[in-house]
Amino acid sequence: RGVFLYIAIAGNRTRMKFIRDAQKNHLDTFQYMPSDKSRQREIRKLSQSASVQSTYISKTAGYPVYKNTAVRYFPLGEDNFAKLVEELNNANHFIFMEYFIIKQGEMWDTILEIMERKAKEGVDVRLIYDDFGCSMWIPSRFIKDMKEKGIKVAAFNPIGPVFNLRQNNRDHRKITVIDGYVGFTGGINLADEYINKKSRFGHWKDTGIMLKGEAVWNLTLMFLQTWLMLTGEKDDYSSYSPEKYQDMAFFSDGYIQPYGDTPVDNEIVGENIYLNMINKAKHYVYITTPYLIIDNVQIQTPVIEVDRT
């Protein structure tokens, strides 16, 4: 009994330290966020419901909205991958990648070759991976291999021999940032089934987006705050801003607001955003996802919307 009590107490202390560190890093990042008050006023004039949503993200999650950003949507993982490879090959200054799953195969081998080559060229190449998501798929000497290739690497929340509550905190992000003004995100991990080079459940349908412009700054700050939490290495964040390496004007595709969620507070930002979009819908709701895992609140919300119509 004493052993289990020790595990529970030690695990709780570890989790509390994790939460404190994550909260501090998250709050410290806010000073680098630009004010979006003028853009919020513009959105308010265009759409009250969009304004409520954007204001919630800005005030609660802390991520501002931007204008000067082009967006490209990829309906399939293989489309996203082809463009990702192209942009990685164009990197001149830095590459930041943060993913939940990495599996050896054609997709990862292609990306790794580019990362290694770019590191040799002097590009700052960094990788964050979730230790749980990758534990069954990468070799035990993965970190050593990456460092030998010149790639800086950090494992999110490494799995220990003793279970504690902190092990439930996982990093499900899928983010790539290239030279500060090119960003990729979506549902695509670095594994062959996501680009249909390997079939586990038939044709895999997942989506991704590419951003080019000012809004990539939110993705950069998400990565850097996690990097600081995992490594203790504090960067000069301003040296990674979108304007640093791209002096041409950014093309605007309307208002863009990348956001992040965190396990260290009681606010379920991601879920609230989706529920709010469903609740505010007037004509239709289209949902596409390879994983339909929903709770009772998420089930009831579409039902209420159907009844309302």
Regions found by a protein language model. Name each.
Residues 291-309:
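Helical hairpin unit composed of two closely spaced alpha helices linked by a short loop
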Residues 263, 290-291:
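Histidine- and/or cysteine-centered catalytic micro-motif in compact active-site loops
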Residues 1-276, 280, 307-308:
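N-terminal localization/anchoring segments of enzymes in phospholipid and broader phosphate metabolism
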